[in-house]
């Protein structure tokens, strides 16, 4: 798992539940007694991981089914949403094994250790990359609406998705190679065992891809989006769009930034002056808490990117076989859209709030008002 970084201490657990290491805190001239984080994790993590798995699996499978059965993947946005849901599912299917391992020990062997660690990393990086693509897609649809009609094609979505998966796999390779099943303190543990140089490289890479890069892209894109929306005249729709955009941006960093900061501090303990007994013990606890928080983000994605839209709720009822009123507007050039007519064609997919799209032939500023329901 991402947080199970190999400790540089030789650990022995005594009967009192404290972790005694050969590390000496020279400020006090005594061995470092660390509270056993694993003991707490064995009680709390299995039920937490189980809840995350259940809600996340149901939510993301629902998104996948609706996108495939109802939407038919006719929008670039829907293609990215599908891949984001798949990323979360890859991430989620590893949780039952981590839950079992936290309660007992790793009993699935070295091959399964590498396989599920690979799925975990690929789902993690894939989720980040598709959030970035959704951000860029939203930027093009709102700020460069006319250009977006030509550039945001299904073919472009498929090609960029394939490239994104390849990059996610490549970013996951170090974690897969250096992860193995090994016996520690009489129990088998599945975790990464990086050489010193590789551990530093992997932590820096993870922070660049998981924190710095998405932060930079989101600030640039959403700054342009906000400037464009603030020039529009429809105040109610404008405020709704701004709220959704800020939710997308803030929630991701709210769930994953603490974890990225903690693993950076944990890897470079000596540089930050955190190599004393008390600090390392607090970092161990913070690592476990922040990773669990980050894992729950895969449950939030279906809510942020899908359930906030009225169109999605309509499609949800259709998927369940309910009889409801027809949608107000055709979706992505679907049924009801006739070539050569000045009709409305949505460019936002399931992210639409009220499903209003761009009218072909309109001036860019006029069309932007239709997109504010995102």
From Swiss-Prot:
Organism: Homo sapiens
Primary localisation category: membrane
Annotated TM spans: 43-70, 81-100, 115-136, 154-178, 207-226, 244-268, 286-309
Tissues expressing this chain: Expressed by monocytes and IL2-activated NK cells. Abundantly expressed on CD14+/CD16- monocytes and weakly on CD14+/CD16+ monocytes, type 2 dendritic cells (DCs) and plasmacytoid DCs (at protein level).
PTM notes: N-glycosylated.
UniProt xrefs under PANTHER family: C-C CHEMOKINE RECEPTOR TYPE 2, CELL ADHESION MOLECULE
Cellular location(s): Cell membrane
Protein name as annotated: C-C chemokine receptor type 2
Lineage: Eukaryota, Metazoa, Chordata, Craniata, Vertebrata
């Amino acid at each position: 798992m991402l947080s199970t970084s190999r400790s540089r201490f030789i650990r022995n657990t005594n009967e009192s539940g404290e972790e005694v290491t050969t590390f000496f805190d020279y400020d006090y001239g005594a061995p470092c007694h660390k509270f056993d984080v694993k003991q707490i994790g064995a009680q709390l993590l299995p039920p937490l991981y189980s809840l995350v798995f259940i809600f996340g699996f149901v939510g993301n499978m629902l998104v996948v089914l609706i996108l495939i059965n109802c939407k038919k993947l006719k929008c670039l946005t829907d293609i990215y949403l599908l891949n984001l849901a798949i990323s979360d599912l890859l991430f989620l299917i590893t949780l039952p094994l981590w839950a079992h391992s936290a309660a007992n020990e790793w009993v699935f062997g070295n091959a399964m250790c590498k396989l599920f660690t690979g799925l975990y990393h690929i789902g993690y990086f894939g989720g980040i990359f598709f959030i970035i693509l959704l951000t860029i897609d939203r930027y093009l649809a709102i700020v460069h609406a006319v250009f977006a009609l030509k550039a945001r094609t299904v073919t472009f979505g498929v090609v960029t998705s394939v490239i994104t998966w390849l990059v996610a796999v490549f970013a996951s390779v170090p974690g897969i190679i250096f992860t193995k099943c090994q016996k520690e303190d009489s129990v088998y543990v599945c975790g990464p065992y990086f050489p010193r140089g590789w551990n530093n490289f992997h932590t820096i890479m993870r922070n660049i891809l998981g924190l710095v890069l998405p932060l930079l892209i989101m600030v640039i894109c959403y700054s342009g989006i906000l400037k464009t929306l603030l020039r529009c005249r429809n105040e109610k729709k404008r405020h709704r769009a701004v709220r959704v955009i800020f939710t997308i941006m803030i929630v991701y960093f709210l769930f994953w930034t603490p974890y990225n900061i903690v693993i950076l501090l944990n890897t470079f303990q000596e540089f930050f002056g955190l190599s004393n007994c008390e600090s390392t013990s607090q970092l161990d606890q913070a690592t476990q808490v922040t990773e669990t928080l980050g894992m729950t983000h895969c449950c939030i994605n279906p809510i942020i990117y899908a359930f906030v839209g009225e169109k999605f709720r309509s499609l949800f009822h259709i998927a369940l076989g309910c009889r409801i009123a027809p949608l107000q507007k055709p979706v992505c050039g679907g049924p009801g859209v006739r070539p050569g007519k000045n009709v409305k064609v949505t460019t936002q997919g399931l992210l639409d709030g009220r499903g209003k799209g761009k009218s072909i032939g309109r001036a860019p500023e006029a069309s932007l008002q239709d997109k504010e329901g995102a």
